[in-house]
Design a protein with these regions (language model features):
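Sec-dependent N-terminal signal peptides
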Residues: 3-11
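Kelch-like beta-propeller repeat domains
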Residues: 12-304
Length: 304
């Protein structure tokens, strides 16, 4: 499908808010992801302090400020997005091994039985991708596949039928992007073309109803290895890296106005981090405080 042009009027405004610290992760992990199910934050996979892929998974209760370990993933994964559809948590694809091999697995977490179960695999292996949820379906965009080649094809999973189908390709293929769903669209934000020296500020929005992409206002900074979460209808985009440094940037996109604001920076700059919003607050979890392989157990909480 062709990319539809929009009239873009860049605007970057300053925002307010404050950060505080929450209970740290039980162990330092980078390249992990997070999602919210029943007002609790789940994280799974990542790269641990030994530099190896991990299968560990944890659940955080914001009300109690407490982490607990849940069932391990069936296999170690990193750069694996998590997403929730209805009452179900999904872990999508990801990378395995220190050599970053892409995988096609789709797992769901059975909260009642504390176990992970397989579902129909992705049409092709992919990791370092982004996932958004619209109309009860997973929309997977970007990332790289076999041979460390960028993937343009988008894929949509319907839990009701346990089937995947193709969708319009992302106009700017990239890995290490972040994705978030808001107002019926999936926003693909930032990332890079396999090269941390060439980070993107690109924002493209996918509409499942029309199977079309549109370009939106660019992010104020160029970042890959970043995270995003939707809080009060706005998309908060946090962290990231270049080849030699990490970002504390915290920028907020309003889908209703197509405008960005710059919010209070992260207390601990990092990449490969996870983000989730619950209870009117933004939680930023783990990641790497140095470019490349590094890990932190820090959990920072932003209250607008």
């Amino acid at each position: 499908m062709r990319l539809l042009p929009l009239l873009l009027i860049p605007a970057v405004l300053e925002g307010d808010g404050r950060w505080s610290a929450a209970a740290p992760l039980p162990e330092p992990i980078q390249e992990l992801s997070a999602a919210v199910l029943h007002d609790k934050i789940y994280v799974a996979g990542g790269i641990d302090r030994t530099g190896q892929a991990t299968a560990t998974a944890f659940r955080y209760d914001p009300a109690a400020n407490h982490w607990e370990r849940i069932a391990d993933l069936p296999s170690p994964r990193h750069h694996m997005p998590l997403a929730v559809v209805g009452d179900t948590l999904y872990a999508v694809g990801g990378l395995a091994e220190p050599s970053f091999v892409p995988e096609s697995t789709l797992w769901l977490y059975r909260e009642d039985r504390n176990r992970w179960e397989p579902r129909a695999p992705l049409p092709a292996p992919r990791g370092a991708s982004g996932v958004g949820v619209v109309s009860g379906k997973l929309v997977v965009v970007g990332g790289w596949g076999a041979g460390r080649q960028l993937i343009a094809a988008s894929a949509i999973y319907d839990p009701a039928t346990d089937r995947w189908h193709g969708a319009a390709p992302i106009p700017t293929p990239r890995d290490h992007l972040t994705a978030a769903a808001a107002r019926g669209l999936v926003y693909a934000i930032g990332g890079r073309p396999l090269n941390p020296d060439r980070n993107y500020d690109i924002v493209e929005a996918y509409d499942p109803a029309s199977d079309r992409w549109t370009r939106r206002s660019a992010m104020p900074s160029r970042r890959g290895g970043l995270a995003a979460a939707v809080l009060d209808g706005a998309i908060h985009v946090i962290g990231g890296e270049t080849r030699g440094s990490v970002f504390a940037n915290h920028e907020v996109y309003d889908p209703a106005t197509d405008r960005w604001t710059t919010a209070s920076a992260l207390p601990v700059a990092r990449h490969g981090l996870a983000a989730a919003a619950v209870g009117g607050k933004l939680y930023v979890i783990g990641g790497g405080p140095k470019a490349g392989f590094s890990q932190t157990d820090a959990v920072d909480v932003f209250a607008p």
